[in-house]
């Protein structure tokens, strides 16, 4: 086995592509590496098309093996399970730029599998997987119009950084992944810390320029190791059938696309399809229903696109830059912490915000170790939202992808843990859908967070843009419908505040989208975003001053870190008793910060008082109230200051002679005691002599446990 290797510099990193030694029964296989992060990518393509196949069955799977990071999986089975959310998102990242590069009419099944086999914690495997998939598809000989390149762009100290390391990403104001061919950008996925439209576009152009080195080296790699190109020819169009369908359907489809209401329009289109199929199959039984539907779909595209290019009104009668009618309601669910319904035309999202404590944070088990996520965003797309029946269950890839995009849009305005010590979860339920439900989720989330009293930095709105391009003519569309998304050449989603962009996602189906066109789209999107923000600000101009009565209130106090073990107790006994007895939730940080969450303010204050007792220092000669915990022959043990036990010797109970301790004291009895001595082993000696229940007792709070105005914040 003599592997063929291609190595090249890519920014600050070295990329290695290797083929010919592993997985030789696959159509193509590439071991792609970037500075010790290695992803093994295979492509298997079927030479024959399944009978009746009428779509392109491309599957992309991305999987991370824990051995790549020198770890053994957790859990009972000790092996990797179903794909995580992160793996699903990276699979989509690979799929989106390669799918449009297969020719129309190519229906052969292809599976791409990317497996992470080694990981350098400083190099994210997603970019390596994209480069490996591009190389493997290019080597395979399938009719793939690539290769593509991929680049990650950061923005640090007002400078763009190519493929920043994990450490650099933490201080970057931008995380943008761009993929494309040598001629055109195909995909952008990004989140930003409120950057301008010009900065975002410059980042896209920068990434596309820098990735050309990847494309050139893959082309050279293919010359050396590529398989012969498949002798595939697109099927000849059935001109006679096309003319028959046109004669029966074209005028009727044109009329149908003047119906503005989606369901009524779809019913009319379905009726036309059924009628045309019935007529043509009656004339010739060999005619394929699938072929007729494909021709009708092409007619729909031609009619809608032609009208847009000609400057005619859109499907629902709008001009190119008009946003659909908006309707906003906040506080719609009485017992939730924050809620809103955002409606844009026939797209509607019910967004709900929930506040939780530190223990509600999501622990994510990644290759490089565990991390905690304090902001959760879940997007649900039930079948009723489009008037259909369907399966309800675990989220599909699309729901995971849309949820992550919406989360990216809102993340930049979320408060820090110091500013707002809550874990926040937002759920967006799509109740109606006709285009851009992910951007409706961004708007709904912003409204629900403000309704919940989350001090977000600014309101965020999202808008989906579209494009229709015919030769040199093009039209950019604001707030696209589902049909315009399906029949157009670009899906371009922008989320942001009045000050700038927080998320940008772009999927382009054709070549020839220039930076100038992208600039027009971004500027048009900005105008639409400002309009939506104006309407949102009328509904709720700022976050609520107070959180919901049904949300937990977090009280913060500071204790000496050395006292943390006392508050937790042996095996967690003390803290468990505190939470169970008061119905509160207690979290303690390593620096001694104690966070108490409770819906009952009195319960929180009671817990704080008990913690103050626990951490307070016992002072010699101080007098305390205590409770008898044990009675023995030689005296009684009394608990003071939240659990510190001291001994009252039989001789110290009273000035009289005591024969039996039980004659004077019983378990649970409250007594007043004075500290006589604390010995070297921290044992406390107490006395009850000359004391009674009216004797003034010491304050139970010492300097270490005092809660100052700076240390305590009642949220």
Swiss-Prot record:
Cofactor: Mg(2+)
Enzyme class: transferase
Reaction(s) this enzyme catalyzes, per UniProt: RNA(n+1) + phosphate = RNA(n) + a ribonucleoside 5'-diphosphate
Gene name per UniProt: pnp
InterPro entries, A to Z: ExoRNase_PH_dom1, ExoRNase_PH_dom2, ExoRNase_PH_dom2_sf, KH_dom, KH_dom_type_1, KH_dom_type_1_sf, NA-bd_OB-fold, PNPase
Binding site for Mg(2+): 485, 491
Native source organism of the sequence: Actinobacillus pleuropneumoniae serotype 5b (strain L20)
Residues in KH domain copies: 552-611
Main location as per UniProt: cytoplasm
Residues in S1 motif domain copies: 621-689
Keywords: Cytoplasm, Magnesium, Metal-binding, Nucleotidyltransferase, RNA-binding, Transferase
Matching Gene3D superfamilies: GHMP Kinase, N-terminal domain, K Homology domain, type 1, Nucleic acid-binding proteins
Function description: Involved in mRNA degradation. Catalyzes the phosphorolysis of single-stranded polyribonucleotides processively in the 3'- to 5'-direction.
Gene Ontology MF terms: 3'-5'-RNA exonuclease activity; magnesium ion binding; polyribonucleotide nucleotidyltransferase activity; RNA binding
GO BP term, pick one: mRNA catabolic process
PANTHER family, per the entry: POLYRIBONUCLEOTIDE NUCLEOTIDYLTRANSFERASE, POLYRIBONUCLEOTIDE NUCLEOTIDYLTRANSFERASE 1, MITOCHONDRIAL
UniProt EC number: 2.7.7.8
Subunit structure: Component of the RNA degradosome, which is a multiprotein complex involved in RNA processing and mRNA degradation.
Stored CDD domains: KH-I_PNPase, RNase_PH_PNPase_1, RNase_PH_PNPase_2, S1_PNPase
SUPFAM superfamilies in UniProt: Eukaryotic type KH-domain (KH-domain type I), Nucleic acid-binding proteins, Polynucleotide phosphorylase/guanosine pentaphosphate synthase (PNPase/GPSI), domain 3, Ribonuclease PH domain 2-like, Ribosomal protein S5 domain 2-like
Top-rank taxon: Bacteria
Pfam families recorded: KH_1, PNPase, RNase_PH, RNase_PH_C, S1
Protein name: Polyribonucleotide nucleotidyltransferase
